[in-house]
A protein has these predicted regions:
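Short hydrophobic segments within beta-strands
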Residues: 12-13, 112, 162, 185
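Substrate-recognition/cap helix-loop segment adjacent to the acidic, metal-dependent catalytic center
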Residues: 97-110, 114-138
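Active-site neighborhood of HAD-like aspartate-dependent phosphohydrolases
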Residues: 1-45, 68
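A metal-dependent, Asp-based hydrolase signature
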Residues: 23, 34-40, 47-84, 102
């Protein structure tokens, strides 16, 4: 049995380490340019519908469902290449890799993401994040429901969870309580949505950019949990 580490850092991918909003903007522009605005809008309608059904973003699955509406359009065969070959490394937030190196001086760094089993791993690999965390990558449909599995794979006395979604931070905090420090980088459309900011309690620590964490020492991260304890 693996002895628990003192601390393990669990980092989300999309809009935490990688600007996924910008990836989506590029995809929208590509669809409009290659297929026209109507086809672009149809793809995103299918994408949103599928995300509601599956609980995660499935870009390739949406493309497959889109294709069923027009099997004669051979241009769609090249559409998957745009997604699979996209230069994800250029969409990392400034300082993202530096943060991983910084945190690694105190404990294991693990990517903890939601997504499909094809496109999401590809994104993490091509962005350089897979290598940065030495292959410690977990991808689930609903990661907040997989905490026992996470703890079994990477046992630790304390976890630091870094995620752009206050909903996720809150749900995991409610389960792990003082065993986890929640860190909220205010990046991406979820993090900046006024409804989300009022619907959920604040994280233990909030930073404006992921790169700001390079200035945080381990005592500051661990102390953020203790500082909020009396108010919970």
């Amino acid at each position: 049995m693996t002895a628990p580490a003192d601390v393990v850092f669990l980092l989300d991918c999309d809009n935490t380490l990688l600007d996924n909003d910008l990836v989506q903007d590029d995809l929208r522009e590509h669809l409009a340019r290659e297929f026209g605005p109507a086809s672009r809008d149809r793809y995103w309608a299918i994408f949103d519908q599928l995300r509601g059904e599956l609980g995660y973003a499935d870009y390739l699955g949406a493309l497959q469902r889109y294709r069923l509406g027009d099997l004669s359009d051979t241009r769609l065969l090249l559409m998957s290449s745009f997604l699979v070959d996209y230069p994800f490394a250029s969409r990392l937030y400034p300082g993202a890799l530096d943060v991983i190196r910084h945190l690694r001086t105190w404990g294991l760094t693990v990517i903890l993401s939601d997504g499909d089993v094809v496109f999401q791993p590809r994104k993490i690999q091509r962005s350089g994040l897979w290598e940065a965390v030495e292959g410690r990558v977990l991808i689930y449909v609903h990661k907040e429901q997989m905490l026992d599995a996470v703890a079994a794979l990477y046992p630790a006395r304390h976890y630091v969870l870094i995620d752009d979604k206050l909903r996720i931070l809150t749900m995991i905090k409610n389960v792990w309580r003082d065993r986890v420090t929640t860190v909220f980088p205010r990046q991406g459309h979820y993090a900046l949505d006024p409804h989300n900011l009022t619907a959920y309690p604040a994280a233990d620590l909030t930073v404006e950019r992921i790169g700001d964490l390079t200035a945080c020492g381990l005592p500051a991260l661990m102390g953020a949990t203790a500082a909020r304890a009396p108010g919970r």
